[in-house]
Amino acid sequence: MREIISDGNELVAKAAIEVGCRFFGGYPITPSSDIMHAMSVALPKCGGHFIQMEDEISGISVSLGASMSGTKSMTASSGPGISLKVEQIGYSFMAEIPLVIADVMRSGPSTGMPTRVAQGDVNFLKHPIHGDFKAVALAPASLEEAYTETVRAFNLAEMLMTPVFLLMDETVGHMYGKVQIPNLEEVQKMTINRKEFVGDKKDYKPYGVAQDEPAVLNPFFKGYRYHVSGLHHGPIGFPTEDAKIGGDLIDRLFHKIESKQDIINENEEMDLEDAEIVIIAYGSVSLAVKEALKDYNKESKQKVGFFRPKTLWPSPAKRLKEIGDKYEKILVIELNKGQYLEEIERAMQRKVHFLGQANGRTISPKQIIAKLKEL
């Protein structure tokens, strides 16, 4: 392990470089701009390319173009910028172009409070586009995870050939401190790169794969010809209105993610064995939860356990159902008006308790303890 001092946004950039990202296209927006700035410094030093575009739409567009050339690529923004990127997010999903999209969440809606924290993009990124969509979204909760979840985001994007969201709230992005991260050799060993077709060019059908597998898009300029389209398409990418081909395509885009959910989903569980109450939280809120439980579990007769999904989408619905069936008192805590609460209650098929706020401020351990005493 290496010990460094950094903030969350710069750790995202460091992880991206070390896992092989060599292109960043974007447009500055608070509170994600530090990622962009760090990439502008680091990429030229390692043979990569950085470009600040005229707006958020062109920022994601050039990143997709770079990815189609075979280069690991990313962009970063916050809620208002992500709203502008949604057309190309849909294109990335449909054409199976891998891309990491960092969303450092700030208070909204609209322009909201640019320098304040929120978790208001959670439901938005579950389904940001028109048409059907299967999201992959990771939620770092610490400086260490700002690094490790970025590595995981790139690996999942390359493995699944799909856009992957790094859904990080402002507090994690701007917290600063000493952190231990994996050695570069460890990162290189765990790095996943997209598959390439090796064979006769006339046999190359990038979208002609099994129903639980992603497309195999060879990088441009290697002599393999295919068509890239946001339209429904057949095995070599040319548009079609055939009902079976179109239906099979959408089924495959879903199933390639659903079939890998055991790999995609990661959770943290604490003190669930004898718990009478279970708290569910994610992102920076989990830090306040852990601080609150240090004292509460020593003083209270009611033991409190903690469940944290690191992967928000696809949701850990099966595990949530198990928790809902086993524990009577469940408290969901979020920096919004109950966005992930909706998914938790859907998975558990029951109502649970909630503590949330959308005022640009963090939830304190004192607020959490006060809520626990009400249950």
Where are these regions (language model features)?
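Glycine-/acidic-rich phosphate or pyrophosphate-binding loops and their flanking alpha/beta elements
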Residues: 7-11, 257-277, 290
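Thiamine diphosphate
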Residues: 1-127, 134, 151, 170, ...
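Peripheral docking tails and interdomain loops at the edges
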Residues: 328, 334-375
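Short helix-loop-beta junction
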Residues: 40-45, 251-259, 291-306, 349-351
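Conserved thiamine diphosphate
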Residues: 116-170, 194-195
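Generic long, charged, amphipathic alpha-helical segments
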Residues: 286-322
